């Protein structure tokens, strides 16, 4: 089996290559992932958009469809090793651990076209930590040829075996500096379920259909809490357009949450 680490270079929203970021323990993300990957015994390779020099000493598979995202990486891996299943890992999985990878490998179903974990919020299969059997990876090129680059839709079309995560936050990713701060807070403080009251301003109430709710969250920061709410409710509202408050006091997005507290979200310039 190939274990393919996705590496795409500079992230537009993060502003840098996430694999080169230094974790709270002082280790680069790419070195952490490479260590986890090698411990599985799989043939570890690095996906790149081109044949540029990799940030770590791993063999490279260059995308055959530049700009095609993870599906392009999967298609390239299949072309390079057409007889091998592919375990694909996203580069921004800062909370991934050895136990999660072992669980995926131990519960793989070769009779299905893929095996994946369910997203902890919406239950849909996660494409960036999944095993694609040859019968599944061989179909990626066809999707790319049609101009369909949606990795999650592709994975769902394979009707994968879907597993529950043994560590609920293990696949929480980071696409922005706020989300990175949330991941690092989880690494430093641990992942613990907490209950909060969330209240919404009139404008948000009209969108969500409720003024207040009690929620259980794994978030450590205000940004992490909003990301869970945004994902669950499919909100198209950026943090730049919101203000979070505690007892009438404005909160920074990386401020740490406290159990049983009340957080108010208000649209900037709104009510």
Over which residues does each language-model region extend?
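Short, charged, surface-exposed loops that flank catalytic or proteolytic processing sites
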Residues: 146-150, 221-224
């Amino acid at each position: 089996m190939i274990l393919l680490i996705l590496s795409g270079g500079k992230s537009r929203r993060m502003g840098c290559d996430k694999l080169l970021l230094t974790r709270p323990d002082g280790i680069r993300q790419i070195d952490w992932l490479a260590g986890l990957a090698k411990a599985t015994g799989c043939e570890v390779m690095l996906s790149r958009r081109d044949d540029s020099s990799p940030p770590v000493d791993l063999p490279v598979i260059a995308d055959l469809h530049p700009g095609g995202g993870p599906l392009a990486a999967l298609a390239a891996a299949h072309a390079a090793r057409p007889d091998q299943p592919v375990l694909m890992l996203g580069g921004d999985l800062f909370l991934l651990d050895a136990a999660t990878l072992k669980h995926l490998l131990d519960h793989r179903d070769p009779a299905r076209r893929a095996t994946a974990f369910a997203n902890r919020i919406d239950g849909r299969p996660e494409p960036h930590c999944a095993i694609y059997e040859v019968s599944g990876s061989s179909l990626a090129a066809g999707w790319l040829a049609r101009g369909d680059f949606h990795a999650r839709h592709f994975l769902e079309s394979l009707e994968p075996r879907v597993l529950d995560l043994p560590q609920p936050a293990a696949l929480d990713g980071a696409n922005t500096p706020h989300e990175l701060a949330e991941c690092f807070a989880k690494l430093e403080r641990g992942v613990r379920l907490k209950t909060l009251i969330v209240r919404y301003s009139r404008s948000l109430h009209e969108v969500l259909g409720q003024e207040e709710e009690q929620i259980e969250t794994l978030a450590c920061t205000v940004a992490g809490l909003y990301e869970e709410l945004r994902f669950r409710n499919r909100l198209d509202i950026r943090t730049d357009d919101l203000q979070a408050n505690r007892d009438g006091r404005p909160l920074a997005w990386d401020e740490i949450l406290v159990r049983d507290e009340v957080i108010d979200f208000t649209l900037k310039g709104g009510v």
